[in-house]
């Protein structure tokens, strides 16, 4: 039986490219090589596509994907050269130019099935401000927030924010993930600095009320029919869950499943599934919640391409549900082909 080609796109132009490499390396080791041939392409920070490695069997633990330090520029290709009839693409890309609809639109133009949400849901979910407004409109609880857009009156924004929110306040670039560019402010001076830092990553800034809460996450899988996992909890040894804590200092542990009341589990899974459908989701996502001491649930964000390393929450949540990492990848390929066929049928 011939193997299906799985194309891994990794790296990318965003500040989250290092996470992308870690996720892609985990995927390349977990794939069932009885069924798949894996071809990998690295996207540089400048947006160049580089043909890297090909795997017909499981690579050794010491094998690493090529990155900026090891790529051969002679292997630079036109982006459209990744096309292969019958192949499915796994864009293991995080952040802007990865999970914001850009690469999804490119793959749709190429007529290649791809894992993950479509152009619309990717672009909406990537923007924290737009996501909040959509979820508010369907009654899913959100923490209080204000918004600053580059070029607006910063002083007026500070006045509005301090009238509506109390310290601590969290400031986030609207279109970044993996906690990149996020700051916690305890004073007006810190708030101003936090907004200025966020503006180095994005022109749109979300300013949120800090809440004392547990961080609970739910995995989602499916197209028209979506399944959700039991929730898992992020347990922090730090003040807040930033990029350094997540990926450098290893100060994050997880409890799977999370120790929460059944009524809360039901509420979170329902909110997650409703949010996924409201944003037009397909394939996969991870819903991140805050759970306060008095039992209030807030949906913080919906991540359309969650971290995919072997120690990431999303694959571990599904493993807890009885779906092993290799089988999860296979299911995602099936869902990608299904949504591709559906999309193509509407264009005839």
UniProtKB/Swiss-Prot annotation:
Subcellular location, record wording: Cytoplasm
Binding site for Mg(2+) 2: 301, 303
Binding site for ATP: 162-217
Gene Ontology CC entries for this record: cytosol
EC number assigned by the record: 6.3.2.4
Positions bound to Mg(2+) 1: 288, 301
InterPro entries: ATP-grasp, ATP_grasp_subdomain_1, D-Ala_lig_Van_CS, D_ala_D_ala, Dala_Dala_lig_C, Dala_Dala_lig_N, PreATP-grasp_dom_sf
GO terms under biological process: cell wall organization; peptidoglycan biosynthetic process; regulation of cell shape
Reaction equations catalysed: 2 D-alanine + ATP = D-alanyl-D-alanine + ADP + phosphate + H(+)
Domain ATP-grasp: 132-334
Co-factor requirement: Mg(2+); Mn(2+)
GO MF term set: ATP binding; D-alanine-D-alanine ligase activity; metal ion binding
Record keyword Transferase present: no
Cofactor binding note: Binds 2 magnesium or manganese ions per subunit.
Metabolic or biological pathway: Cell wall biogenesis; peptidoglycan biosynthesis
Keywords: ATP-binding, Cell shape, Cell wall biogenesis/degradation, Cytoplasm, Ligase, Magnesium, Manganese, Metal-binding, Nucleotide-binding, Peptidoglycan synthesis
Family under the similarity heading: Belongs to the D-alanine--D-alanine ligase family.
Protein function: Cell wall formation.
NCBIfam families linked: D_ala_D_alaTIGR, PRK01966.1-4, PRK01966.1-5
Protein name per UniProt: D-alanine--D-alanine ligase
Organism annotation: Streptococcus pyogenes serotype M6 (strain ATCC BAA-946 / MGAS10394)
Lineage, top ranks: Bacteria, Bacillati, Bacillota, Bacilli, Lactobacillales
Gene (name only): ddl
